[in-house]
Amino acid sequence: VSQNLMRGMSDTLFQPDGTLTRGQLMTILYRMAGTPETEAATPFTDVASGRYFTDAVAWAYEAGIAEGVSGTTFAPNAPVTREQLVTFLYRYAKYQEEDVSAQGTLAGYPDAEAVSEYAQIPMAWAVEQELVNGIDGKLAPKGAATRAQIATIILRYYAIYGE
């Protein structure tokens, strides 16, 4: 919060156990990148101009960090899953030209088979870097990420790669 990457849900409420949305995550990554200027438009009909996430989604799409749930839908208000979170963060790290070659194994997790194909390399990277440790011994890739989880992951990311 002090870095202005995340804001509370109100002036007095952070809501750490609240579900993180796709729009909120793009906004966090956009702020981590320093809110770069973008002239890009998105193909997403559900990303209206003037919303808090509009520039962030446009930037993330242009930078190759984010894709929609379809060619024309981003679903900014939908919960972001844990596998989507690590995939977007993995792509952000690549965008920042960080070394993302370290990949661990998911074999120790009983739900490793549940990780979508697109998220397997990012999840293996996140596990190897100890950005994610699992929940009760599971990856829970389809589970909704919380605001507390992304705050923790950002702290771990900065500990590894710096600001």
Predicted regions and their residues:
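Feature responds to low-complexity, polar/acidic, surface-exposed segments characteristic
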Residues: 2-55, 63-83, 89-119, 133-145, ...
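Catalytic cores of secreted/periplasmic or lumenal enzymes
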Residues: 123
